[in-house]
Amino acid sequence: MNKKILIIVPFPMTESQLSNRKEQSQKVTLNKSIDLHYQPVKAAPRTYVSQEDYLIADIGILEAGLNAKIQGYDAICVDTVSDSGVAVLRSVLEIPVIGPGRVMFLTALMLGEKFSIVTMWKEWFGLYHKTLTELNMHEKCSSIRSIDVIPDNRELLKGKESNIVPLLVEASKKCIEKDGADVICLGSTTMHQAHEILQKELSVPVINPGPLSYKTAETILSLNLSHSRKTYPKPKIPNHQMVFKMIEAAAINEKDKPLEKIEKDNI
């Protein structure tokens, strides 16, 4: 029997933009019984740089995944290294919910003693510190290096590879040679288009978080495992309708804003 995995994309976007995210499925070999379905959220923060952004992201992703089991999905992967919405979805769902951030950092320690995170933007450092703190893994992270390029969360690196990838290679080599990293972690699923070249250019493993999360979900499903209800207790009085109405209102508020420019506002 086929297993359906819902990939929640953390920004509203067009079908053309969504295709950039779907390319991640070509970077991993999954069992033929695994079907991936990509679904953008209806509303999201402009960027992921503040606690307000994190809260809005959690709510948007919660809304997108609340009915996943009813809709026939067997697992969820959240397409952001921030792991936004993962904990809250686990509290309301029985099916596995996988975040690429935690999966990436934990896998890095199976491949080496220490890892570094290479990312686009210093403004994202808070996301990594949050997860590293939750995992008590700061001592295992050799460094976090940024190339200081404002990310494009919808078009990703498309058309910009020749300018951006060399910067990522340079930053990664500094992580290895100066900081002592044994493994390089890509700081965002939006960087997946750079993975192949980075792996060819570097002497250590480079983890592509999105595809890794898909493979992890497949493995968890094959073992009939899911998250612990002791860690993620269900709400005593669920209020899903409040969440749906909040996001419905938020989506109306964002409706007339051009998707291609939404991240550039207020930066």
Please tell me what each predicted stretch does.
Residues 8, 70-80, 180-189:
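Periplasmic-binding protein-like
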Residues 90-111, 198-217:
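Short, acidic/small-residue loops that bind anionic groups at enzyme active sites
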Residues 100, 104-138:
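Conserved beta-alpha
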Residues 211, 215-216, 224-267:
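C-terminal functional extensions of proteins
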Residues 1-56, 122-159, 249, 255-261:
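N-terminal glycine-rich anion-binding loop in soluble enzyme alpha/beta folds
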Residues 51-67, 163-171:
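Glycine-rich, highly charged phosphate/nucleotide-binding loops
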Residues 183, 189-200, 206-207:
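A C-terminal functional module that forms or caps the active site or interfaces directly
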Residues 134-187, 194:
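Active-site rim beta-loop-alpha module in soluble metabolic enzymes
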